Structures are given as C-alpha cells and as structure tokens.
Amino acid sequence: MVKVAVTGALGRMGSGIIKTITETDGLDVVAAIDIPNHPKKGQDVGELTGLGKIGVALSTSDELEAVLKESGAEVLVDFTAAAPCVQTAKTASKLGVNLVIGTTGFTPEQRAEMEDAISKNKVAATISQNYAVGVNIFFKTLELLAQKLGDYDIEILEMHHKFKKDAPSGTALRAAEIIQNNLNRDSNVIYGREGITGERTKEEICIHALRGGDIVGDHSVIFTTEGERLELSHRVTSRQSLVSGAVLAIKFVAQKKEGIYNTFDVLDLN
C-alpha cells in the first residue's frame, strides 16, 4: 500500500485526487494539507470532500514537515501554486518523500530551485504541466507535425476557466517547447498581438490565451500555409482526466528511487 499525502486538499484537483485514491487499490490517503489557518483544519477530509469519513484530518501547510513525518507518507501530490509548491517540494524531498507535481506557473528560477532540491535529496519526482493521457498523445503527435510541417505558420490557442491564475497555460508553453525542439529552423515564441504588428514573420510561434466561464482546458495548435490548414486540438471536459493521469504518476513514482520524470516516462512514450 502506497501512502499518499495531498496538498491543496480542498482544491479542484486535490479533492478529486483524494476521491480517486480512496477508490484505487494499492493507494491510501494518509495526509491532506491545505493553506495555513484554514477554518476547517482538523475536520475529516473525507467528509469535507463528500466521501464520508476516511479517518484523515485536514492539516495546514505550516505544519507540513510534522504531518509528513507522522503520517509516513511515501508520495506527496501537489496541485497548488508555484511559490508554495517550491517550498513543499523542498520540505518533502528533505524527508525522502517522492513527488507528483502538477502545479504550473513556475519561473525558471523557481523550477531550478525545486529540481535542485529533488536531485540533492535523491528522491523521485514526476513534474508535468498536464497529466491527462490524451494531452500527452497530443504532445507526442506535435513532435511529428513540427518535424514534417516545419515551414508552416504555427499558432497556439488555449482556453481556460476565469479562475486560472497563470497565462499562458503550462500546457501551451509545453506545446511551444515541443514544437521548437522539433523544428529544423529558427523560431521565437510571442504572446498575443496588438496594434500595428506588420507582416507575420516565419519565425513566430504565437500563443493566444483566452479566459472565461468554466472551461476546464482547451488547446489547439494550428499549422497554416498557402491553400490549407491543419489543426490539432485537445479538450478536457472533466478534471477527472487530469486526476486519473496523476494517479498513474503516483503509482509510477512510488516505484522509483530517484530522478526527475515527466508524463512521457509515466506513459512510456519516450
């Protein structure tokens, strides 16, 4: 039985992960953590998420180290925000706890700080902008399209709910990174357009971010040239697709001793 701690326990992703873990053989929720001074601290997290009692009280992140030690957690799952996630990763890795990180919006410095702690403490971690299985097939397909349609104009469009904190999405940034890594030409990423921009340059890969309503996550990459257009799209209609992928990552990382992995590793797409 793999003992799992979940941060952001009452958030959209955290509560879904807790529910799915309780329904999954071989996994056990042993700690649920949310923001400091949370008014529901101490209450059973199962009751707070509509599952009924599961015997795990809601803890807060200011007591993370003590909670991880007491619970004996082997894997910690984090879908929160960039700054607290870095601190969580540093604390967990110091205690030898493996990590599944789905938080996005890291600066390069934050990402480096987090990865340094993971490597220094010799734990295993999966870090991904999107754990949905389908979106990772989308990423894999992008590799081929960028190689074969590299002389086309390329635009990326992403849409998310109005509450999303970062833009563009981590998934859109990852798509741009994959495209750049597979093009046989120079390229540069720009973000939206405004004013008199002049003629589009061949090097541009432009990311457009839309926000509104309750859109879980839509991503499209558009390849255009004279006479034709090819669009590759992925739409998340329920966060369960992300949750299910994260649970696969928990099982994967629980078997690893150290190293930093991504969802291509989890799904054997490399």
Swiss-Prot record:
Belongs to the DapB family. The lineage of its organism: Archaea, Methanobacteriati, Methanobacteriota, Methanomada group, Methanococci. This is 4-hydroxy-tetrahydrodipicolinate reductase. Gene3D superfamilies: Dihydrodipicolinate Reductase, domain 2 (3.30.360.10), NAD(P)-binding Rossmann-like Domain (3.40.50.720). Keywords: Amino-acid biosynthesis, Cytoplasm, Diaminopimelate biosynthesis, Lysine biosynthesis, NAD, NADP, Oxidoreductase. (S)-2,3,4,5-tetrahydrodipicolinate binds at H161, G170, T171. Coiled coil: none annotated. The active site is at H160, K164. GO terms for molecular function: 4-hydroxy-tetrahydrodipicolinate reductase; NAD binding; NADP binding; oxidoreductase activity, acting on CH or CH2 groups, NAD or NADP as acceptor. Its EC number is 1.17.1.8. InterPro entries: DapB_C (IPR022663), DapB_N (IPR000846), DapB_N_CS (IPR022664), DHDPR_bac (IPR023940), NAD(P)-bd_dom_sf (IPR036291). The gene is dapB. The keyword Lyase does not apply. It is found in: Cytoplasm. PANTHER family: 4-HYDROXY-TETRAHYDRODIPICOLINATE REDUCTASE 1, CHLOROPLASTIC-RELATED (PTHR20836:SF0), DIHYDRODIPICOLINATE REDUCTASE (PTHR20836). It comes from Methanococcus maripaludis (strain DSM 14266 / JCM 13030 / NBRC 101832 / S2 / LL). NAD(+) binds at G8, A9, L10, G11, R12, M13, D34, G102, T103, T104, S128, Q129, N130, Y131. Pathway: Amino-acid biosynthesis; L-lysine biosynthesis via DAP pathway; (S)-tetrahydrodipicolinate from L-aspartate: step 4/4. GO terms for cellular component: cytoplasm. CDD domains: DHDPR_N. It catalyses: (S)-2,3,4,5-tetrahydrodipicolinate + NAD(+) + H2O = (2S,4S)-4-hydroxy-2,3,4,5-tetrahydrodipicolinate + NADH + H(+); (S)-2,3,4,5-tetrahydrodipicolinate + NADP(+) + H2O = (2S,4S)-4-hydroxy-2,3,4,5-tetrahydrodipicolinate + NADPH + H(+). Catalyzes the conversion of 4-hydroxy-tetrahydrodipicolinate (HTPA) to tetrahydrodipicolinate. One of its GO terms (biological process) is diaminopimelate biosynthetic process.
